[in-house]
Amino acid sequence: TMPAYKDSMLTEARLASASFHKLENDKIEIEFTTKGAQPYTVKIKDYKAYDSTDLYLIKPQASEYGISLFAGENINTKDFVFQVAEHNDSTIIMQLPFAGGGYIQQKFWLESGSYMMQNELSFVNMDGIIPRNVSMLDIDWSVVIPRLEKGYKNEKQYSKLDFYYDGDKKPEEIGRGRDGSERIDT
């Protein structure tokens, strides 16, 4: 059964139908779903997998990205359909509105000639929705990366995820050759 939300706009977003939108540059094509405001597929252009098929870093239904937080009640963004506020070839902005007038915003963009997707998470006018004593949120991203190379053992050993804290010049690394997690307090 679906949980009942105190915020009527969350209930509406939970029941809404998702839509799909693409960002694309000369290097990469990313399809997003509004359900959870997250990447749905990621295709690398000009490269092929070991079996000569298109090279997908993320295939359909192989990724789940959600932000868990307390916003008057416990929520996880993966459960809600966001509204598209802006979309063109290189940028998409999706928002999850709350009845109090605030919203959670996910902005994704691609720059020409780059394989990197940029992401900016914002909490806009959420002062009356997220209590002041809430200083943490959990970002959970689970993704199954398809086999891309013929030598799976070598591929697994050298696969990793890097992320940057705002203002950092050197990336942090999660999980080379294994599952990994990182806790970041806000």
Model-derived features: positions:
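Soluble non-transmembrane domains of integral membrane proteins
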Residues: T1-S8, A13-T186
